[in-house]
């Protein structure tokens, strides 16, 4: 059956065309969803209401429920009709073409289970993980805490994930065809002196499935991990990562760029050291930054003494300081991906002005909803 829209009116998705039964049903359901839920993802009213309901649940439970709901709407075929359009603003970074510079940071979709639904929201790229060679449960619950007064979250998840095998199976059957980054880390029980082997295993496994790879040495929730950011430990790890990258390039006849994700908790000397080490390593980018262990911005909050990394609005300035410092050292020799404290268009644009080529969001996405993607992309595009 084919249904022809009235010749003087646009079709249910705003186009004059003939619809197949499946397309008509998808558009019809989209209209129903918009009417019933009130432009659910534009965030003006309904997202705030839904968020307030979800925030009555424990954070990790709300997180999982939200992603399952997103998957359900995606499977109905209506999700992409519900979200506001994200302005096109193509950029080329690390040799990859991004439809817009606003990506999803690692941590939201650790096991690459929700890529297809998340891909409907308009992200310029999606980063999944952190994945480790072996599955691990992470730290005991509760391990995530909201600080809504600060638009912030404290987490001590501890690289909980189902391991490389599970993630690869998800990636192999994905329908999402946008730019995919895979964030890799070390298992908690791997001795520090063997850390490089975990990263090598991950890089080898994901190399031919990823558009880019991120080496995570900056989570505060794996004991000893942040020590890999400094001194000979960093230089030796970067050398091992580069060696594995070149070996994989030879095996697959394809070059996959690798970025390194760093913490915001380093002084100017640390920034200079990291910048020099990255350039000397021959790797391809740096992601600045991960969560902070500082509690200065949230002092006095009932959760401020919880162990873990603080993300969200309080990381805005620390992240900017690192980006500016890196850019001063690196210039255009190595691209920077800015992440941390992006809660609106202005905070996304200032990351670009500070020297980043791309940005990523996570905690701001939880507090603001999918409308933040388009707002951030529009603000960056307006910079010219």
Please tell me what each predicted stretch does.
Residues 129-178:
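A gly/proline- and charged-residue-enriched helix-loop-helix capping module
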Residues 45-91, 155-160, 164-165:
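An N-cap/entry alpha-helix motif that binds or orients negatively charged groups
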Residues 111-118, 266-278, 342-359:
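Catalytic cores of alpha/beta
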Residues 138-151, 297-308, 365-384:
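C-terminal helical cap(s) of enzyme catalytic domains, especially alpha/beta-barrels
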Residues 67, 71-72, 78-84, 220-233, ...:
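Glycine/Thr-rich beta-alpha phosphate-binding loop at enzyme active sites
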Residues 127-133, 217, 287-293, 347-375:
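Glycine-rich phosphate-binding active-site loops on the catalytic face of alpha/beta enzymes
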Residues 187-200, 227, 233, 259-280:
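Active-site glycine- and acidic-residue-rich loops that bind
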Residues 152, 162-177, 230-252, 307-334, ...:
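Alpha-helix-loop-beta-strand connector modules within alpha/beta enzyme cores
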